[in-house]
């Protein structure tokens, strides 16, 4: 799953970012429509939706992609139980980075999923497997 959420079209989007963060996510996450080239609506990862998908599909491992985009956001957030949860800025997408490690621990805590992997960039081999 992406480290943030995107949406096209109308309808509710309770985790939508402020415009400044939305522009950063669209730019560094390459979130533009294939046909129109318009930027997609961007928001914070919605753990209410994530937990519903985990429950419905029996997920026991999550792979977080586009985490490198968070290094461009001053105050990243996640959305849980209709509230935004702020996190410290992430300097490096690495388990050695305290802020990034706290994000991984937060995800484990909010989802009850014990295994997480994440990507550090857009290339095929840029994945880190965690236990």
Could you tell me what each predicted segment is?
Residues 1-131:
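Non-transmembrane, aqueous-exposed alpha-helical and coiled segments at domain scale
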């Amino acid at each position: 799953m992406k480290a943030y959420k995107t949406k096209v079209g109308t309808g509710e989007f309770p985790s939508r970012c402020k415009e400044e963060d939305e522009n950063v996510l669209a730019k560094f996450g390459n979130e533009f429509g294939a046909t129109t080239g318009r930027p997609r609506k961007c928001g914070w990862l919605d753990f209410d939706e994530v937990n519903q998908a985990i429950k419905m599909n029996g997920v026991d491992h999550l792979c977080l992609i586009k985490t490198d985009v968070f290094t461009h956001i001053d105050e990243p957030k996640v959305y849980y139980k209709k509230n935004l949860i702020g996190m410290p800025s992430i300097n490096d997408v690495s388990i050695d980075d305290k802020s990034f490690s706290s994000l991984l621990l937060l995800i484990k805590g909010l989802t009850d999923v014990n295994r997480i992997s994440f990507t550090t960039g857009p290339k095929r081999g840029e994945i880190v497997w965690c236990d």
